[in-house]
Amino acid sequence: MVTNHLLEIENLGQSIWMDNLSRNIIESGELKSMIGKKGIRGITSNPAIFEKAIAGNAIYDADIEAGIKASKSVIEIYESLVFKDIRDACDIFMPVYEETKGLDGYISIEVPPTIAKDTESTISEAIRYYTAIGRENLMIKIPGTPEGLPAVTRVISEGINVNVTLLFSVESYINTAWAYIEGLEARAAKGEDIDKIASVASFFLSRIDSNIDGLIDEKLKKVTDETVKAKLEAVKGKVAIANAKIAYQEYKKIIQSDRWKALSAKGAKEQRLLWASTSTKNPAYSDVMYVDELIGPNTVNTLPPPTIDACADHCDVDNRVETNIEVTKEVMENLKDPDININIDQVMEQLLVEGIDKFIKPFTSLINSLEEKVKKLTPV
C-alpha cells in the first residue's frame, strides 16, 4: 500500500488544511473525498482563489442569472456565490469539526481586502459575513495590519473565529497572539463562554525567501570576494523557515504566560500558528521544504493542491519545528552582517503592503469580470 505522508504529519500534532476552494470540487465530491483520502482538516480561501474559481466558470451562471432576476448588485451577486461555496464547504467539514471538538474543520473566508486599513469596516464586515454564512465552523480572515489587529480583538470578543492573515514578521505574530488574548479576556469579562472560539495566526513563508533571495542575487552580481559570496549564498532559502521557527518559540512563551493560563483554565483554545504561502517558488529548492521543516505540535499548514500531492508522495515527516534553533537565530543575525546588510524589518513591511495589494488586485478583477458576465447574462 502506498504511504500517504500527510497522515503521518497529523500524528505529530500538525493539521493539514488546503489552500483552495471552488464549486467544482464541492459538487464533484472531490472535496469530501480529500478528508478521508488525504487527511485534509480544513480550508483556507482568499480573493485570488475565488477569482480563479469563478471567472470564466459556467458552473456559477445559474446563480448569477438568479441574482440578476432578483435585481441584486454585482457585489451582492459576488457574495451570494462565495457565501454558498463557503457554507457548503462548512457543511462538508462539519464532521471534522465535531470529531476534533472544534480543533479543526474550519473554512476561512477573507473580509474584502479593500478595507484592510479600516478597523471599523473590518469589524462590521466580519460580523456581517459570520452572521450571513451562519456556520459555527467558519473562520473570518482579517489581515494582521496595525488597523486589523484591534478588529481581531473586537471580533474575537463577539465570539467569532478568526484567521489572522498576512503575518510576515515575528513581531506581527506576537501582536496577533496578544490581540487574540485581549479579545478572549474582553469576552470572559462579559461573563460569556470562551471555550468554543478558535483562531489561527497565518504566518507567510515562501514570499519571504523569494524577496530576500532576490536581494541576495543582486548583491552576488556585484561581489568578487569569495568569502563574501559564501556568506551571501549561505543565507539563501533559509530566512523564511528561520523566521517561522523563532515565531514558534514566541508562541511557546506566550502560552506559558499567566494571562494565557487564566484563559486556558476557562477552556480557551490556543491560537495556533498556521504556515501559509507554503508552495516553493524556487525550483532549486525541495517542493515540500516549507512542510518538512516546520512540522510540530499545535500547528497548521495550509497547502495548495500541488503541494498536497507532493507531500503525500514524498514528505520526510519528523518533528522539526524546534530543531536547530541556534542555527536559526544565526541565520537571522547574519542578515545584519555588513557584507550581507539586509534590513529584515523593511522587507517584512514591504511584503505586508504587497500582500494586501496581491489580494486587492484579484478581488477587483473578479468584481470586474462578474460585471461583464452580468451584462452578458442580463436579458435585453
From Swiss-Prot:
Pathway: Carbohydrate degradation; pentose phosphate pathway; D-glyceraldehyde 3-phosphate and beta-D-fructose 6-phosphate from D-ribose 5-phosphate and D-xylulose 5-phosphate (non-oxidative stage): step 2/3
Chief location bin: cytoplasm
GO biological process, one term: carbohydrate metabolic process
Gene3D superfamilies, alphabetized: Aldolase class I
CDD domains from the UniProt entry: Transaldolase_like
Pfam name, any one: TAL_FSA
Root EC class: transferase
Swiss-Prot/TrEMBL keywords: Cytoplasm, Pentose shunt, Schiff base, Transferase
TM helices/strands, residue ranges: none
Subcellular compartments: Cytoplasm
One GO term describing the cellular component: cytoplasm
Gene Ontology MF terms in the entry: transaldolase activity
EC number from the UniProt entry: 2.2.1.2
HAMAP family: Transaldolase_2
Alphabetized NCBIfam families for the sequence: PRK03343.1, tal_mycobact
The protein's name: Transaldolase
Organism the protein comes from: Trichodesmium erythraeum (strain IMS101)
Lineage: Bacteria, Bacillati, Cyanobacteriota, Cyanophyceae, Oscillatoriophycideae
GN (gene name): tal
